[in-house]
């Protein structure tokens, strides 16, 4: 009943003209959404504390003056109000549309940011059929310590954190996951920004930085935009040595279904984005995109006994599918308030089979579904923004069988001949449910003595439920057969059986954060002190994160900035779920543990920067030092004679980042052309240990055949893969002819790193080899022609050419056999064609 009392002030503001059947249904859906989540979590103690803290301060009223009622301004985005002192790089929808790229994921457009490195620094030229987004690292932090936000709501998928602990058991848990819950096509976004240092106290849950996306909202003008985009392997160059050429024609996936080699593929994208005014105060945006990829592979169907047991193969494609849906409503019941309601959906699917499996297909899914309700109201002294959201993230696997039989055939000397499997590993799913409520009050600037103040206060509550479900027992049988010289099988074969139990594992997690900051202006100084306080019921730590940044303007075009900040990262509460799954699996190789002894991971930051406008140039020099502490890592150690894995707080490591950025402020005019240029350079130095997972630093290892400790090995090779990257951007437009030409050039430092060698040497000591590959330069280009046909109607054609010069470099070596291996190279030249229609 109390819930409906809260709704009365909002419902009373609805104009009579708005009341019709269609709009009544929208209101009912919103009320059901709020009521369902309110009753689900109303007994949570942290939620009650949160509501009692923030229910009372806002009692003032003021009307916002607008010049055009039909243009609906977007809601406040947290971190926007005082972010003038934050280090922020923003990509608008216009910049997104003209940037040369491949799959159109959010992270594909961040390559020009000097604070971002990719988890796999060099892309794999043999895997260009994939369409998943890449993981990124911000300022040298772990990729899973990058926070992702969409419309004020955190969308990090914590289910991705635990995959490494399930090594060796991957078939009985979902096979794919990703840190990003939603795989949005970037054309659905109005902007993407990265906050990398001096980040507002309103943002948390990271040690690296934050990627903030704002979905398309109604702009005040009705429109429809259609887009089709495609490429295929015949439009691309692939560097392949003689050793790998012989296996490309009969390429097969690996033992867990990964298509390591993809010589033939076909990728397509379709996108529609529509904006529609429903009445004078209500607008709607609908977006849908589908990305598909078909990757040629060869499937095992049997063995030819008359041809020395040669594998018989049949061409069957792996499939990739990514569907994304967006529906946003923007309502201004009166000029001083605004309500947004948004629905979002993402479904990524892989249809595949395993290398040695004869008759079982597997479907792996990465899904996300969510809704957001936001209310913004203006008072006499400021603006109050409230956001309520619910999301469900799901990773699941569907298999045609829950029983598998694995057969290994040996010759009469007990040497392996071939092996195969029939059946499958059953269905399973991992689920994460998030309930999010956040509130922020931004005061209008006011003067206190000779200083101007702009104060923001707010808080965030999030309740998360995790669960794992396996509906059936999974039965496996391993058969060892010996083929005698006369062609018959030795009887009886040796067999072992095992059962992985069905069941459900549940756990939950709550987190609350409150924050405050004040942007102070005095003479030529700007200061922004702030604080963020967090508490969760998982690690049960009280985390206090001070934030401070100061800026001094000795002259109008010159600025010096100093920042001292602490960022608390994600604590990965889903590890508790992983612990329960291991118990369900009766897994004795992992240490079942109580996580209460773990400390919250965090990073301390010192930042210095200098910026100077010189005529039409803007120059920025920056330095960031990060001390990363208490990161949660996987450790392997012997316990009672068995080598077991567990989670611990890892050793701290420092990161130093030096950046140089130069760009022109206004476009240069040359004839009928307009030019914009940018130059960026970053040098990253880190002592991070990133070989597999961080184990005991005194653990003995072999590097290039020499016995040493792991810490000694780290001192001999570069831990950051690449020391530096230089980035150049040159864009040209010819408005009279509706032509845009965009160019991005990346020069990367030589790779100096190491890789672990496969094989069991019987002594339990890991073996590594170092490698050194030269610099790599890549030029990506895009040209777009968009003539107007009539009125608002226009068509466009865009051609993207990635790696125009077809320059590649080797980035690793893969073993084929004890006597043969092949090099893996970066992608060669690649063409993309895009056409569209807008009206």
Curated annotation (Swiss-Prot):
Family annotation (InterPro entries):
Plug_dom, Plug_dom_sf, TonB-dep_rcpt-like, TonB_rcpt_b-brl_sf
User: Start and end of every TBDR plug domain?
Assistant: 80-216
Q: Which GO terms describe its biological process?
A: siderophore transmembrane transport
| Membrane topology designation | Multi-pass membrane protein
One matching Pfam family: Plug
Ordered alphabetically, the record's keywords are: Cell outer membrane, Membrane, Transmembrane, Transmembrane beta strand, Transport
GO CC, one annotated term? cell outer membrane
Q: Where in the cell is it found?
A: Cell outer membrane
GO molecular function per UniProt: siderophore uptake transmembrane transporter activity
- On the tree of life, the source organism's domain of life is Bacteria
Q: Which family does it belong to?
A: Belongs to the TonB-dependent receptor family.
Name this protein carries in UniProt: Uncharacterized protein HI_1369
From which source organism is this entry? Answer: Haemophilus influenzae (strain ATCC 51907 / DSM 11121 / KW20 / Rd)
Q: Which taxonomic lineage is given here?
A: Bacteria, Pseudomonadati, Pseudomonadota, Gammaproteobacteria, Pasteurellales
């Amino acid at each position: 009943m109390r819930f409906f009392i809260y709704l009365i002030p909002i419902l009373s503001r609805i104009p009579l003209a708005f009341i019709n059947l269609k709009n009544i249904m929208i209101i009912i859906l919103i009320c059901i959404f709020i009521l369902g989540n309110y009753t689900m979590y109303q007994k949570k103690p942290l939620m009650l504390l949160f509501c009692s803290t923030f229910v009372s301060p806002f009692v003032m009223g003021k009307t916002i003056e607008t010049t055009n009622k039909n243009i609906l301004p977007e809601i406040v985005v947290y971190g926007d109000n005082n972010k003038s002192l934050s280090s922020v790089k923003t990509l608008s929808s216009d910049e997104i549309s003209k940037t040369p790229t491949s799959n159109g994921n959010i992270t594909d457009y961040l390559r020009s940011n000097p604070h971002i490195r990719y988890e796999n620094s060099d892309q794999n030229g043999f895997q260009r059929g994939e369409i998943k987004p890449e993981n990124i690292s911000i300022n040298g932090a772990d990729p899973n310590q990058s926070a992702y936000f969409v419309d004020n709501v955190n969308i990090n998928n914590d289910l991705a954190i635990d995959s490494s602990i399930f090594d060796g058991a991957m078939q009985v848990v979902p096979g794919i996951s990703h840190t990003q819950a939603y795989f949005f096509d970037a054309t659905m976004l109005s902007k993407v920004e990265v906050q990398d240092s001096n980040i507002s106290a309103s943002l948390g849950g990271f040690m690296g930085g934050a990627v903030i996306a704002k979905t398309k909202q109604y702009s005040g003008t009705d429109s429809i935009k259609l887009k089709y985009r495609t490429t295929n392997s015949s439009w691309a160059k692939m560097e392949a040595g003689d050793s790998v050429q012989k296996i490309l024609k009969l390429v097969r996936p690996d033992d867990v279904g990964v298509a390591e080699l993809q010589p033939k593929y076909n990728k397509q994208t379709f996108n529609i984005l529509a904006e529609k005014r429903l009445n004078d105060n209500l607008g709607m945006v609908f977006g849908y995109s589908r990305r598909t990829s078909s990757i040629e592979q060869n499937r095992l169907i049997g063995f030819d006994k008359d041809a020395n047991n040669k594998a018989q193969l049949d061409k069957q494609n792996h499939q990739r599918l990514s569907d994304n849906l967006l529906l946003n409503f923007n309502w201004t019941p009166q000029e001083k308030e605004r309500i947004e309601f948004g629905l979002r959906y993402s479904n990524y699917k892989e249809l595949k089979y395993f290398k040695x499996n004869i008759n079982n297909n597997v479907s792996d899914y990465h899904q996300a579904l969510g809704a957001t309700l936001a209310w913004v109201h203006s008072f006499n002294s400021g603006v109050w923004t409230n956001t309520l959201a619910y999301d469900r993230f799901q990773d699941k696997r569907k298999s045609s069988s829950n029983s598998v039989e694995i057969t290994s055939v040996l010759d009469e000397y007990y040497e392996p001949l071939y092996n195969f499997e029939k059946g499958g590993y059953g269905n399973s799913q991992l689920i994460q449910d998030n309930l999010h409520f956040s509130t922020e009050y931004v005061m209008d600037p006011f003067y206190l003595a000779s200083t101007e103040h702009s104060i923001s206060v707010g808080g965030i509550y999030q309740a998360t439920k995790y669960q794992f479900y396996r509906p059936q027992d999974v039965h496996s049988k391993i058969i060892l057969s010996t083929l005698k010289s006369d062609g018959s099988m030795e009887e009886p074969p040796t067999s072992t059986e095992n059962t992985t139990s069905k069941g459900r594992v549940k756990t939950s997690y709550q987190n609350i954060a409150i924050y405050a900051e004040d942007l102070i202006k005095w003479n030529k100084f700007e200061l922004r002190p702030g604080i963020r306080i967090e508490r969760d019921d998982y690690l049960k730590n009280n985390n206090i994160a001070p934030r401070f940044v100061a800026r001094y303007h000795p002259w109008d075009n010159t600025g010096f900035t100093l920042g001292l900040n602490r960022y608390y990262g994600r604590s990965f509460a889903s590890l508790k779920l992983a612990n329960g799954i291991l118990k369900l699996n009766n897994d004795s190789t992992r240490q079942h543990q109580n996580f209460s002894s773990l400390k919250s991971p965090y990073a301390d930051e010192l930042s210095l920067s200098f910026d100077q406008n010189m005529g039409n140039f803007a120059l920025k020099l920056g330095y960031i030092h990060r001390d990363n502490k208490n990161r949660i890592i996987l450790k392997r150690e012997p316990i009672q004679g068995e080598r077991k894995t567990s989670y611990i707080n890892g050793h701290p490591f420092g990161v130093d980042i030096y950046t140089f950025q130069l760009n022109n402020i206004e476009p240069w005019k040359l004839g009928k052309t307009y030019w914009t240029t940018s130059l960026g350079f970053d040098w990253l130095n880190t002592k991070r240990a990133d070989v597999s997972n961080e184990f005991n630093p005194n653990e003995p290892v072999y590097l290039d055949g020499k016995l040493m400790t792991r810490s000694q090995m780290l001192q001999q090779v570069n831990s950051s893969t690449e020391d530096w990257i230089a980035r150049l951007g040159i864009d040209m437009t010819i408005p009279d002819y509706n032509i845009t030409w965009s160019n991005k050039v990346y020069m990367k430092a030589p790779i100096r790193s190491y890789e672990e060698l496969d094989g069991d040497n019987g002594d339990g000591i890991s073996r590594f080899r170092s490698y050194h590959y030269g610099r790599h330069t890549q030029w990506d280009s895009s040209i777009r022609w968009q003539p107007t046909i009539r009125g608002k109607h226009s068509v466009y054609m865009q051609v993207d050419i990635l790696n125009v010069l077809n320059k590649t470099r080797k980035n690793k070596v893969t073993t084929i056999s004890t006597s043969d291996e092949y090099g893996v190279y970066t992608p060669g030249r690649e063409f993309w064609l895009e056409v569209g229609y807008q009206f």
